[in-house]
Amino acid sequence: MALVVGAAGSALTFFGAGFFTGTLLNTPESELCLKVLALAVFVMAVMGVLRGFFQGMGTMMPTAISQIIEQIVNAIVSIAAASYLFSYGVKLDAAAGITNGKSGAIYGAAGSTLGTSLGAAAGLLFLIIVMLMYNRVLQKNMRRDHVSRQESYASTLRVLIMTIVPVILSTAVYNISGIVDQGVFKYLMLDVQKADKSTVEIYWGIYVGKYKLLTNVPIAVASALSASTIPALTRARISGDWDEMRKKTEGAIRMVMMICIPSAFGLTALGEPILDLLSWNTNEIAPKLFLIGSASVIFYGLSTLTNGILQGIDRMQIPVRNAVIALVTHLLLMISLVQLGKLHIYGVVLAYMFFAILMCILNGAAIRKHLDYHQEIKRTFLIPGVSSLIMALAVWLLYQSLHKVIGVRISTLLCLILAVIIYAFFVLLLHGITEEELRSFPKGRTIVRMLKKIHLI
């Protein structure tokens, strides 16, 4: 099934690249990038099945190692291929007598995209090797498994489809929202408002390449926690343990908020210094996007997790329905802000944030209804919020005092380190995390002993 779906998706991506980039997204220069990325669609489809198999067997090790291999190969190939193909593109322009041509940028971007495809292929190769090594054990376990009834492939496929399709649709709506936003934004700016094309491209490049890239880092942690929450909730649901389901839900939400709330405050306070640290602060718009939209980290983290919770309690269709409602509503808001309010890329950020807020509201209502769940407020939201506010004010004042003396990069790194320390100190001081929860962390017992010595717990 994964082979068929992956091959179909890969073919659609490759042969439809011109239509997607030129007609839908109004960025014909990215056609080559999308064609190079087509291989990754097939590879990821197969790799997802193998990762899911090992996770279902109760081990995350093959998945974790394959992800490390994938990212290492991705980084190496992206840098090398981008450099080589950029030079190749420049030579093509020179040979054609074109000055200030786009071939260098087009081929360089395609080289960078090649890293994604080959990184995924390297991760898949590792998983295939592990699967071949494990096959002997699997065959032995299958021979020992005496069952009274053998399920047919048709019934198994039917269950898989009924489980997979709602998850895919929910994820697809999330991803489609970005594509739709791009198409609508460029249509409004270029065709309706007749804005300068290079300016519009700069706006969108800052939004995707800087704002969304940095805000997606803590959101990715929420996605990982969401994926790990689903099996535990499913086991509790099958055993009929509603108290355990509510306990797992509360713990997962608290953990995500412990990460996402300080991340949002940190990006608000240090967004511009972080951009300077990465040498990305080349336009005054970028820092403003973080001032306006860093709160999206909180709402996207929570909405991603609540999607997983609803899937874990076998309410697969609800996240899909909620995502469609949020997509349509946020699109109407974005059109109003960009076209009527003339807010250009700021309108996109506000609508992007509204999408996640609405998802949180709709998913939260569904969880309350189907799980009889009542959210704890103090330790989940108030204490992380107060601790994050103190941390953000402290590091902002510190940065303002230091950056003219010791330089932007050193002062930013120092503030980032101190931000973690200050936040952790106040969370512990305000009893935002219990000793039992600390003990569940890696090296948790050592951490508890150390904190007891300084009387923080």
PLM region descriptions:
Residues 195, 199-222, 253-255:
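Alpha-helical transmembrane segments of polytopic membrane transporters and translocases
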Residues 91-110, 128-171, 240-243, 369-384:
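Interhelical loop/hinge segments that connect adjacent transmembrane helices in multipass membrane
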Residues 45-67, 295-325:
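Membrane-interface junctions at transmembrane-helix termini in multi-pass inner-membrane proteins
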Residues 397-457:
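Membrane-proximal transmembrane or re-entrant/amphipathic helices at the cytosolic face
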Residues 1-4, 12, 157, 161, ...:
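Interfacial transmembrane-helix starts/ends
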Residues 219-239:
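Helix-loop junctions and terminal segments of transmembrane helices
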Residues 18-36, 250, 267-297:
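Interfacial segments at transmembrane-helix termini and the short loops linking adjacent helices
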Residues 61, 72-125, 130, 317, ...:
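Membrane-interface helix-loop junctions in multi-pass transport and translocation proteins
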